[in-house]
Amino acid sequence: MIFNQLFDEKSHTYTYIISSGKGREALIIDPVIEKTNEYLNILKNLELKLVKVIDTHIHADHVTGLNELNKQTNCTRVMGETSPSEVIDIKVKDNEKIKIEDIELTTIH
């Protein structure tokens, strides 16, 4: 399993890159737009394909990299069902499962 925690000092935001490593699929949680190239380089170096990007909430502390990552990788954009954003591909409910390969995350609102 691959679990990378990255910290953006400017916005004090933690971002996570997660993959089982088996089929080389990955997801990113709470990306910061200024770090998009860094995330893409990590994915490339680890030979991972970004399939999902998740924002856990609307970010007042930074501009999300969700849409930029979608533009560059065609990954699926995920947020909670109460998000007012109209550029989300999947809106998840409380206690819903988000899966990539054999990794399963449970949403909490």
Residue ranges and their predicted role:
Residues 1-49:
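Conserved beta-strand hairpin/beta-sheet module of binuclear metal-dependent hydrolase folds
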Residues 12, 33-109:
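Active-site HxH/HxHxD metal-binding segment of metal-dependent hydrolases
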